[in-house]
Amino acid sequence: MGRFGMSPGPNVAITYCRLCNWLLRAAWMGQELLSTFAEELGSVTLIPDDTGGVFEVRIDGRLIWSRKEHGRFPEIKELKQIVRDEIAPRRDLGHVDHKEH
């Protein structure tokens, strides 16, 4: 059970290449998601993997970002928007949602 007797929110799992030393990147992205979605998320899990170049983000087991598929890491702004669209679609992310000029 989560806070106030409610069920815990969704889990975000970040699988990262241990051999590539991407722990800090994964941890930073996890911290950003926890800070932004403190009320909505149940947990963020970091999963080290020895698969070369792997960097994947999943919500409750469903893949939402793959470095292999996209050919790059997500920008934190776009990752927050993807997570928001999945767990709190009506939520305004403030400056993250505003277009740059």
Model feature map: region roles:
Residues M1-H101:
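Domain-level signature for proteins that mediate thiol-based redox and metal-cofactor handling
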